[in-house]
Amino acid sequence: MARPVKVCELAHHLNIPIWEVLLPCNFCTGFLTYQELLEFDYKDFNLLWKDGFVFGCCAACAYRSAYHEFTNYHQEIVVGIEIEGRAAANIAEIVVRCLICLKRLDLLEKLDICAQHREFHRVRNRWKGVCRHCRVIE
């Protein structure tokens, strides 16, 4: 059987409820809270398997990682729909993650950025924008 890649798959595989999953963070080794377990799947992260052990990423480490990548590996900025030309793909096909929390943006979030002429950033050859949740606190 293939190894689970999502928290809900791991819980199902172990035949336990999600709130009983003890998932260490790959970066700080602290255990993810129940809220972070739910956010992990919502943000479309994948579990990391090392030597038969499974790891995730807590919210604090995701924020730190996003900040580190942005400050050290930022490449360019495009405004709104210009992203289609730079990426040579349709907006629906372009993978964009949140610049702040690393959540994978859905189509409505990407279209909203385009409609409001907000910025997309290319960081480490991957596209970033600000998700609806982080835009509220921005």
From Swiss-Prot:
MF annotations from Gene Ontology: DNA binding; zinc ion binding
Q: Report keywords, A-Z.
A: Activator, DNA-binding, Early protein, Host cytoplasm, Host nucleus, Host-virus interaction, Inhibition of host innate immune response by virus, Metal-binding, Modulation of host cell apoptosis by virus, Transcription, Transcription regulation, Viral immunoevasion, Zinc, Zinc-finger
Q: Supply the Pfam families for this chain.
A: E6
* Location(s) in or outside the cell: Host cytoplasm; Host nucleus
The highest taxon in the source lineage is Viruses
> What do the Gene Ontology cellular component annotations say?
host cell cytoplasm; host cell nucleus
Q: What stretch or stretches form a coiled coil here? A: none
Q: State where the unnamed zinc fingers lie.
A: 25-61, 98-134
Q: Name one GO biological process term.
A: symbiont-mediated suppression of host type I interferon-mediated signaling pathway
Primary role: Plays a major role in the induction and maintenance of cellular transformation. E6 associates with host UBE3A/E6-AP ubiquitin-protein ligase and modulates its activity. Protects host keratinocytes from apoptosis by mediating the degradation of host BAK1. May also inhibit host immune response.
Under the subunit heading, UniProt states: Forms homodimers. Interacts with ubiquitin-protein ligase UBE3A/E6-AP; this interaction stimulates UBE3A ubiquitin activity. Interacts with host BAK1.
Q: What is this protein called?
A: Protein E6
**Per the UniProt entry, what species is this protein from, by scientific name?**
Human papillomavirus type 49
